[in-house]
C-alpha cells in the first residue's frame, strides 16, 4: 500500500509542480519573446501621438529588450533538461545542429549580398568580432548564447555536485557581481551589457532544476499574500 502511494506521488509530481507549466509552455513563451524583440527593432508606431494608446504602444516597443531576458531565462531552463537526459557530446551536437549551422548559412548568404571580405566573414562566424570589435555587427544573440552553451556543462557539473543547490546558486551570483563591479570600467560597454544577462540565464537553469526535481506549489488565497511551497 505504501509503495503504491509513493509510486502515485512520483508519477503525479509534474502535475503537482506549478512551475512545470513554464516548461510546458516554454516554446510558446519563446515565440512571444521573439515577436517582442522583432517589434522593438521593426515596429512602426501607428497611433496618434496625443492618445493614451501612443504612450502604451511606445512603452511596449521601448522595453522590448525584456524579450531577450525572457528568451535567456527559458533557454537556461531547457538546457538543464537537455543535460539531464543527454551526454555532453550529444548536448553539444544538438547546439551545433540547431544554432551554429543555421547561423553560418545565414552569415554566408548575407556576406554575398553585402560583399563582406573573407576576413570579416571569418571573424563573424567564429565570434571573434563579437569579442574584439562589437557584439552588434551581425545577429549578436547567436554568439552570445553559444558562449553560454559552451560553459553550461561545466556549470551543470558543479551544480549537480553541490549539496545545497540554492547556496551554490547564490554563491555564483555573488561571484558574478564581484566580477561585474571590477569589469565595469574595463570592459567594452556593449560586451559588458551581455555579461549582465548571465544571471538571468543561470536563474533559468535553477528554475529548470526546480521544475524537474522539486514539487512547487504556488497558492494565493489573499491578493496581498503569495504562498510558495517547495
Residue ranges of predicted features:
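N-terminal membrane topogenic signal
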Residues: 15-32, 163-164
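Aromatic-anchored segments of alpha-helical transmembrane domains
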Residues: 35-42, 107-108, 112, 125-128, ...
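Juxtamembrane "helix-exit" motif on the non-cytosolic side of transmembrane helices
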Residues: 44-50, 113-119, 179-187
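Juxtamembrane transmembrane-helix termini
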Residues: 2, 46, 64-95, 104-120, ...
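Interfacial loop-to-helix transition and helix-capping segments at the boundaries
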Residues: 56-68, 128-144, 182-203, 230
Amino acid at each position: 500500500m505504501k509503495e503504491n502511494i509513493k509510486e502515485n506521488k512520483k508519477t503525479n509530481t509534474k502535475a503537482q509542480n506549478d512551475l512545470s507549466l513554464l516548461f510546458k509552455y516554454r516554446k510558446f513563451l519563446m515565440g512571444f519573446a521573439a515577436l517582442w524583440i522583432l517589434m522593438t527593432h521593426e515596429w512602426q508606431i501607428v497611433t496618434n501621438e496625443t492618445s493614451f494608446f501612443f504612450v502604451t504602444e511606445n512603452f511596449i516597443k521601448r522595453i522590448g529588450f525584456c524579450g531577450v531576458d525572457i528568451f535567456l531565462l527559458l533557454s537556461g531552463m531547457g538546457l538543464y533538461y537537455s543535460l539531464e537526459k543527454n551526454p555532453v557530446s550529444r548536448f553539444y551536437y544538438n547546439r551545433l545542429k540547431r544554432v551554429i549551422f543555421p547561423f553560418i548559412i545565414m552569415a554566408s548568404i548575407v556576406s554575398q549580398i553585402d560583399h563582406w571580405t573573407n576576413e570579416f566573414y571569418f571573424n563573424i562566424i567564429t565570434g571573434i568580432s563579437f569579442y574584439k570589435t562589437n557584439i552588434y555587427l551581425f545577429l549578436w544573440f547567436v554568439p552570445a548564447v553559444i558562449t553560454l552553451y559552451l560553459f553550461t556543462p561545466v556549470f551543470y557539473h558543479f551544480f549537480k555536485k553541490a549539496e545545497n543547490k540554492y547556496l551554490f546558486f547564490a554563491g555564483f551570483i555573488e561571484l558574478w557581481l564581484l566580477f561585474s563591479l571590477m569589469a565595469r570600467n574595463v570592459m567594452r560597454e556593449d560586451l559588458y551589457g551581455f555579461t549582465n544577462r548571465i544571471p538571468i540565464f543561470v536563474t533559468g537553469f535553477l528554475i529548470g532544476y526546480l521544475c524537474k526535481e522539486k514539487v512547487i506549489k504556488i497558492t494565493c488565497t489573499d491578493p496581498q499574500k503569495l504562498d510558495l511551497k517547495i
